[in-house]
Each structure stands twice: as C-alpha cells, then as structure tokens.
Amino acid sequence: MRTLWIMAVLLVGVEGSLWQFGKMINYVMGESGVLQYLSYGCYCGLGGQGQPTDATDRCCFVHDCCYGKVTGCDPKIDSYTYSKKNGDVVCGGDDPCKKQICECDRVATTCFRDNKDTYDIKYWFYGAKNCQEKSEPC
C-alpha cells in the first residue's frame, strides 16, 4: 500500500514524464489502466530487481532500461510533447532527449496493450522479497 501512496503522490505532484506516462497508459489501456501497473511484478512501479515475472512485467523492465539510457534530461520529471491518434501515441517535439523519453513511455504503453492477456493479478503488489534472482542486463 505504501508503494501505491508513493506513486499517487508522484503522479499527482508532477507534470512531467511520470504524469504523462500515467495519462498515456490510461489513454491506451482505459481510464484507470495506470493503477494496474503501479506495483506489479518485479519491475512495474518504483525500482526493480530480479527477473521479470511475465511479459507484462518485462514491459516495465524494458521501460526501466530505456530510461537508464536517456542522457541530457530527466526521464521522470521532464515533460515532452505527444499526440493521440486512433488509440495510439505519436511522440513529437524538437528536443531529442525529451522525444526519447516519450518513446520509452510509448513503447511501454504499447507493450502493455500487446501483452494485456499476460497480466496476472497474483503479481499485483508482488513485493521485492519475491524478486531476489539476479537481474539480467538491459
């Protein structure tokens, strides 16, 4: 529950990428889609360790890796430009760093949609204690 509260504070208090990522998830997955990914498996939510639990959690693992490769701006707080088109997201803007953040979020959101059948409620609030295996490299 603490993780949910932390994420809620972050999403409400930030008008940057995490806020936009949540809005993007809701657009693609449905109005409350973001709640499903606040604390799921070993990688969805704050932090991440161990092996992804399933294809849905792997989306978050890849997203974490993508954020880790961003240089020159802060993926968690910097705002970017995107538009919505026929259920998809199109990243825009002139700043290459911010566009890279948007692409990380877009790819993850699309991954959630493409793997929604792998989502398993048993991994919601799974907990770090269940994610003790060695992490694979990005």
UniProtKB/Swiss-Prot annotation:
It is found in: Secreted. The lineage of its organism: Eukaryota, Metazoa, Chordata, Craniata, Vertebrata. It is an enzyme of class 3 (hydrolase). Homodimer; non-covalently linked. It catalyses: a 1,2-diacyl-sn-glycero-3-phosphocholine + H2O = a 1-acyl-sn-glycero-3-phosphocholine + a fatty acid + H(+). This enzyme has been found to be not myotoxic, not cytotoxic, not hemorrhagic and not lethal. The keyword Signal applies. Expressed by the venom gland. Residues 1-16 form the signal peptide. SMART domains: PA2c. The active site is at residues 63, 105. It comes from the Eukaryota. PANTHER family: PHOSPHOLIPASE A2 FAMILY MEMBER, PHOSPHOLIPASE A2, MEMBRANE ASSOCIATED. This is Acidic phospholipase A2 BthA-1. Belongs to the phospholipase A2 family. Group II subfamily. D49 sub-subfamily. It comes from Bothrops jararacussu. Snake venom phospholipase A2 (PLA2) that displays edema-inducing activities (activity that is inhibited by EDTA and dexamethasone), inhibits phospholipid-dependent collagen/ADP-induced platelet aggregation, possess hypotensive as well as anticoagulant activities. In addition, this enzyme shows bactericidal activity against E.coli and S.aureus. PLA2 catalyzes the calcium-dependent hydrolysis of the 2-acyl groups in 3-sn-phosphoglycerides. Inhibited by EDTA and bromophenacyl bromide (BPB). GO terms for cellular component: extracellular region.
